[in-house]
C-alpha cells in the first residue's frame, strides 16, 4: 500500500496535517474548487519564486493564505507591493477579506516538490535525465536527507516506448507511517512529450502523537 499511495495523504492525521483547514456545512464543493483554483493561480503566477506548498485557512468571512517559497523576495516585491497586489486578486476571487503570509523554505534541497521541479526544469533544458536525477540525489543527501528516491517516467531520451527509471540512495520506508517522507511531483514538457518526475525524501522518524513541524 505504501508503495502505491501518495505518502503525504497516507500520513494525514498520523504525523501530517491538512493543507486546507476549514469546515463547511453547505457549499463544501464550491469552496473546495475555489481552493484548487486559488492554488493554481498562485502557483502559475509565482512559479519563479519556487513554491513548495500553499496552505489555506478559512474562518468566517476571512481567508488566510500561507505560501511556502524558496525565494520569498520575488513574492514580496519592493516594499511589499507584490503581496498587496496578490491580496487584492485573492479577495476578488474569493469575495472575502484575505491575509497573505510568506514563509521561507530555508533548505530547498530537502523539499521534495522543489527538487522535483528542479529536475523537471533541467530535463526541459535538455540535460540528460540520469545526470539530473543523480545530481538531485547527491545534493539532498549532502544536506542531511536520510534517503531519497527520484523517478522519471515517459519517453526518456526520446525513446519510442515510454518507460520508468528511478534512482535511490539511503532508506525510503514508505510503509512506515511514523517515517517523515516528503513527496513531490512535477512535469517536464519536452519535444517528445511530457516526462513525469516524482521525488520521495525521507527525513527521519517522528514519535507517535507528534506532528511534523518543518523549520521553514
UniProtKB/Swiss-Prot annotation:
Record has Methyltransferase as a keyword: no
Keyword Ribosomal protein on entry: yes
GO cellular component assignments: cytosolic small ribosomal subunit
PROSITE patterns noted in UniProt: KH_TYPE_2, RIBOSOMAL_S3
One GO term (biological process): translation
Entry's Gene Ontology molecular function annotations: mRNA binding; rRNA binding; structural constituent of ribosome
InterPro entries: KH_dom, KH_dom-like_a/b, KH_dom_type_2, KH_sf_prok-type, Ribosomal_S3_C_sf, Ribosomal_uS3_bac-typ, Ribosomal_uS3_C, Ribosomal_uS3_CS
Keywords annotated in UniProt: Ribonucleoprotein, Ribosomal protein, RNA-binding, rRNA-binding
KH type-2 domain: residues covered: 38-106
Record text on subunit structure and interactions: Part of the 30S ribosomal subunit. Forms a tight complex with proteins S10 and S14.
Family: Belongs to the universal ribosomal protein uS3 family.
PANTHER family cross-referenced by the UniProt entry: 30S/40S RIBOSOMAL PROTEIN S3, SMALL RIBOSOMAL SUBUNIT PROTEIN US3C
Chain's role: Binds the lower part of the 30S subunit head. Binds mRNA in the 70S ribosome, positioning it for translation.
Name of the featured protein: Small ribosomal subunit protein uS3
